[in-house]
A protein has these predicted regions:
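Conserved N-proximal alpha/beta basic substrate-recognition cap immediately N-terminal to
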Residues: 7-110
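A short beta-strand motif that forms the metal-chelation/ATP-contact edge
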Residues: 51-56, 123-126, 175-177, 243-258
Length: 275
């Protein structure tokens, strides 16, 4: 197979660029070892015509447009340009709501509003569009005054829309998947995080490891991924003290740092299944 491989721009990988690049390089290496013609394309460069597949971690609009154009010519993109765009916070939140997938209660906010709506505290204020690339894109909010200040900061940064999600007490669990929901050999892993790219996990504290249905989480995660369209994905959920599962994040092609070796092998399997 002729495969174009595109890494993630460092600007889209805050505090995670080394881990993202490690997965990218390992996957490219394994593709080459299997005899596939793998061409690395820097973010911003043209994608050559005639590719059978495109493995990418990009999130830049220009490259997603170029990937979409090659998809129309017959290239299989993993993840597709459309699916990657669906991982924008506002979009995946809407998709999960439509699919009936449990999330913390949330409210859509306009940062230009002069009257703050009545909300329950504490909660999380999140930039609505795109992915988190700045520490203030997701903020823990304990009071109305903190909310007003945080909304003002987003407005100053030129961010027009935000999402306010109620805080759910419980354990944060990270999950990772590769494959389709109907794939018998799909890859799924989960673990309790110790530290994320911005340290948000510290708010929930040391995991209590509340019991929950792991099979239900896997089913829910792949249902969400299928609705969004991603075949390589990661995410975060809250496990409440009574074992309820609340999805709080879904993202395209995470670094899989805890499972890099086996994840790279699974990604290669997925890519080569497209021929």
């Amino acid at each position: 197979m002729k495969i174009a491989a595109i890494p993630r721009a460092s600007a889209d990988s805050p505090n995670m660029s080394e881990k993202d690049m490690a997965l990218f390089r390992l996957t490219v290496e394994k593709l080459s070892e299997e005899g596939h013609c793998t061409v690395v394309i820097e973010d911003g460069d043209e994608i050559p015509a005639g590719c059978d597949a495109i493995f990418h971690m990009t999130r830049t609009a220009q490259m997603l447009d170029r990937i979409a154009a090659r998809e129309k010519e017959g290239a299989a993109a993993i993840n597709s340009a459309a699916a990657t765009r669906n991982c924008s916070r506002s979009t995946f939140t809407e998709i999960l709501t439509r699919e009936g997938i449990e999330q913390p209660p949330y409210t859509l906010l306009d940062t230009s509003m002069s009257i703050t709506p009545v909300l329950r505290f504490p909660g999380w204020l999140k930039k609505s569009d795109g992915w988190s690339s700045h520490p203030d894109d997701v903020q823990y909010i304990a009071t109305k005054e903190a909310l007003i200040n945080a909304i003002g900061n987003l407005r100053t940064r030129g961010i027009a829309k935000a999402i306010y999600s109620e805080h759910i007490e419980g354990d944060i669990v990270k999950f990772y998947g590769i494959g389709r929901h109907d794939d018998r050999d799909k890859f799924f892993r989960l673990h309790y995080p110790t530290d994320g790219k911005f340290g948000y996990e510290k708010i929930n504290g040391v995991p209590h490891k509340y019991p929950f249905d792991e099979e239900k989480l896997q089913t829910t995660a792949f249902k969400a991924a299928a609705a969004i369209g991603v075949e390589i994905f990661g995410g975060d959920c809250i496990i409440s003290p009574d074992g309820e599962i609340y999805i709080i994040d879904i993202n395209d092609c995470p670094s899989f740092s805890a499972y890099r070796e086996e994840a790279a092998e699974e990604i290669v399997r997925l890519i080569t299944s497209k021929k």
